[in-house]
Amino acid sequence: MHLVNLLEPWILLRLAAGAVTVLLFARASLTSWRILRHFDVARHSEGQLALERRADLSAALVRVGTIVQIALLAFTMLAGDKLSASIRGAMCGYGVFHATPWGFRSLGATAGTAIAAGVVSELYSFDARVRSFDLARPLAIATLLLAPLSAIDLGLAAAFALNLDLSVVASCCSVQLDAVAAGVAGPEGLGASTRAFATTGAAVAIALAVILALLAARRPQRGIIVAAAGASLVAFPFAVAATVLEVAPHVFEVPQHVCPFCLLRPSVLGIGYPLFGAIMLAVICGLGTGIGALLSRTSAARSALTPFARERLRREAFAWIAAFVLAALPIARYAIVSGGASLFH
């Protein structure tokens, strides 16, 4: 255990921000617990009115916590990149997170919590348009899940920080990813098939997600909305895989360079931040709208779903289009400067 790591500004700020999200979601969860136990729209007592006001406070806390959690994800990636200068051999954030078994677990928990919080925040935005309290209990249950998720995230971040040895000689991404890169970079065999599958799958899945989102925005029916959400969820892993296997090599013009952390470096204008951000925004909007459609079982909720779905699904489509354009730019640039030559031949 390396308590001295707590003196590192990047680590200290990361843990402090994580504690803020835990407190925000924990406070919102207290109200959610009271709602599950005592909320009854048929009652008109002072206690019921107080619960309704507290529900609005809970929504505000979740929204603020979501903003902090998403910013925390970006900050975690940035902190990993900055800490790479303190570890010999680590050329980017990959070497930092790989230096301890807790690194990627912590990063995964931060990303998962950010997406979950984003979806719940979308549901609160939908609930604000519903002229009834039909979603009070489902939202209370969803909010109760955010507190333990953020606590797990903070615990893993603390384990990562306290087990990180800044005095070791770490391996850079090119060394750790050589086995993968050697296969993927080749023009033939399993590696090339994996890259082609990821790239083609991403293009098809994103196109399908955009088409379904625009169709659902034009005609907001539950079935189409849920299908658009499902397409967005399917496109997510394909988009991430294609970013690593196809986009990253073209950014650096090196076929075996498949490190997503290097896409966050200033030397490539930090293209990874808007690219991954657009993918994340599309998934959050899609899932939030899809779950909202599934929860719309009353006339009040269905009436509010139409304008909400139109707005959010257009945002989802534009986010996927932005991600596709950002991913295509390095590939198009390489095709121009190389005279149309393939990077992988």
Task: Enumerate the predicted regions with their spans.
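Polytopic transmembrane helical bundles with strong interfacial aromatic enrichment
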Residues: 1-247, 253-345
